[in-house]
Amino acid sequence: MSSSNATTLNEINTLNRISSQLTIWGDVVFFIFGISGNLLNIYVFTQRSLRRNPCAMYFLSSTTACSIFYFVSMPFRILQYGFNIDPTYYLLGFCKTEYYITFPTRALASWFLVLACIDRFLRSSPNITYRQWSSFKVASYTIPITILLVFIGYIHIPIFYTINGIPPICAGQPGFYRIFLGFWHVIIYGSGPPFLMFVFSVLTIRHVK
């Protein structure tokens, strides 16, 4: 091997080590700040004055979903990108379980914010019938129903996710399912919740004007 090739290889290895260290420490910082923020949110939304506030219940549920997502996904990410260790690459159970937890909880965090926007829309409505739907009782039913529907909606993950490819990777089965999964993420997580939040926020502003 020539000296120039050896130098290039050393530079590549150095860059890889730097990249791994940045990933590890960046993810650790992100994890600490994310969990700290979520814990503060949980502390605020569990105060006595907010315990029966439906909007606060939705925010608390969103924060809880975010916390579960962080606790499950971030350790795997640190192991994967920082140490090249990822049990989802060779343990099918880990593969299916991790993504069946992270995808629904990530989506739930957004959908609970949608419910909070809908609650504000109902609360600000001049129609007394609409205002009655903004209540602790409605929220106590809506939250578990939403959790159930989202996890049912993502039931295809443990069915169609598998380990394939060289090198092995945990992903959806190639072919039609990959296409479906792309559209599913766009609608259920990428564009659906933000669009509904925008719509109900605009409608709420119209109510309070």
Where are these regions (language model features)?
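Loop architecture of class A 7-transmembrane GPCRs
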Residues: S2-T14, Q80-T105, R131-W133, K137, ...
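Alpha-helical transmembrane segments of integral membrane proteins
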Residues: S19-G26, M57, K137-I145, L181, ...
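Hydrophobic residues within alpha-helical transmembrane segments
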Residues: I32, S61-T64, I101, I145-L148, ...
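Class A (rhodopsin-like) GPCR signature focused on the TM5-ICL3 interface and adjacent 7TM helical core
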Residues: F33-S36, F112-S125, P158-N164, V186-K209
